[in-house]
């Protein structure tokens, strides 16, 4: 047959049209079925060349083969040592589980709308704690001796008494009955009980009153006995009372005063007691110890007992000590051989509020007490009732609150301090209150060690010698105890600011030196501290108080802002609140004002950041956001690159959260820890880790050394006792530990108090 020239073209794929079917043999029927399904699946979804082979957990497996997870590639991509992949693996290994969030994104908005300001001009309020202007109310007219009144005028520059001083002197100089002094903070309450006390003792020892010996000398001297005891809750307050008392006694040099407080050497205190004292200022724990163990302390002539800050004495758990002190004073009291000394003891209780614990303390110590208040005739019944239950703020104090998201807390505080100290002479001194000691240490390092990090990061290899010189200069300017340093974060060349820190975990001599340095400082300065500096301390020239962390109770808030606007001077206070349930705390703030809180103003984080980082230029709307973000990112890099500061930030973060949960029961709904965004809060401590991965085991860095020192001292005392020596220096328990134990016991009784973070 001839060829007809017909060509047939068939297009076939790469795979065979007919694939021979493999027949599986061996094994169980389940294994054969699984293998058959896998083969059918591969036939339907053929694998392209160069594609990774999918792994399956089914089918027969070779027991000698190591199984690899399906997420891991079959072969790693080979790159250079300096490639991107190698660098990313190194970064992930060095800093795992870090997330850099934006500073201005996903921040909660305030729940309460901003109130419109009133159109009527607000007149400046008259100071409520200022000295009286009336010329008739002088110290001489109230019963003080001319010598003491002249000393107040010439040496202390006090021309007229305050309202509470007038009321207390009118009562305590004439009668010997017990008294309860209630006055707002900053009204001169210390002099209200010290002036009558000193005047009564001076009257007894005055030569004109025939209280002299054959040589015409006063019969009252340091060996005459102890006449008065003043108890205060904290060591700092005892130191301040002692300083005021010493200044008063310069006009009566024959009257000797002294102090016994925790943290000092008992041997030196016993030596002072043996020499003789007429007025003693003490803390309850140390006085109870001396009454029990020191025979040189003779209290048979004590005729005046003052309990200053009575509410704080009860909150710290000193109820048992106070009961023991009062019982020992009653049991050891004897008739005095000195003419003019009262026959019975007068007890004076001082407190800013009349709470239940103060009433309980009054039942223990007072008998038929007289209630002393400033200007009771100028107040109606409703105002009196409100003052008894709540707290009062000085009328001249300008207070404001800022609604700041958790992310923006630290950068907003920095912006506010930048704006405050932008011009020289605007603000002299400021106090920043935080909740715990770890937070004090962290913020002190943030505000004072920034320059050191910048110098080291920029010129680490080229200018090491210059960096060492700068660091040595910085260290030379700082204090030897590490509590004073230049505030580089918010200082400027025209207005340098010094930074101080203070908390209860510092040794006593360091706390005293830091307080004295801050009080005597003539340059602009800032004190970052806990509530240890909130009670009774009269720090001069404090123009601004910032509550970075809200107080644990409304009473503590009153004492915090009471560090400014004292004795009629002007002052400002700012409290940071987060959006949400904390906004309800504004109603608590308004209760402290006589006008219902009309003078209370509101601001936002955006306004503070614009003024602090953006200046007064309105055209650059985004410049302040970029500057704030750069400052925050630089701070986070500083924390990541320095393990010491990173650990400090983590400790501060955890301690802050624990302290946040210790608000009193009546205010706990406003500070609900369940509504706290832990991730956003971590950013305010320069942390990039997830909250669940922030773990800092162990004690604070200083606690371990303190425990070692205490154990070594205890072992030394034990060896002395075995050898038959005296144990005058033996201290049964550490003051800080015992105070914390007493406070925890008190919390278990009431279940509505602040924890040890109030002490820190």
UniProtKB/Swiss-Prot annotation:
SMART domains: DEXDc, DUF4217, HELICc. It holds the Pfam family Helicase_C. One of its GO terms (molecular function) is RNA binding. It catalyses: ATP + H2O = ADP + phosphate + H(+). Residues 396-609 form the Helicase C-terminal domain. Residues 456-470 have a biased composition (Acidic residues). Residues 23-34, 77-94, 701-716 have a biased composition (Basic and acidic residues). GO terms for biological process: endonucleolytic cleavage in ITS1 upstream of 5.8S rRNA from tricistronic rRNA transcript (SSU-rRNA, 5.8S rRNA, LSU-rRNA). Residues 58-72, 99-110, 731-740 have a biased composition (Polar residues). It is found in: Nucleus, Nucleolus. It comes from the Eukaryota. The Q motif is unique to and characteristic of the DEAD box family of RNA helicases and controls ATP binding and hydrolysis. This is ATP-dependent RNA helicase dbp7. The gene is dbp7.
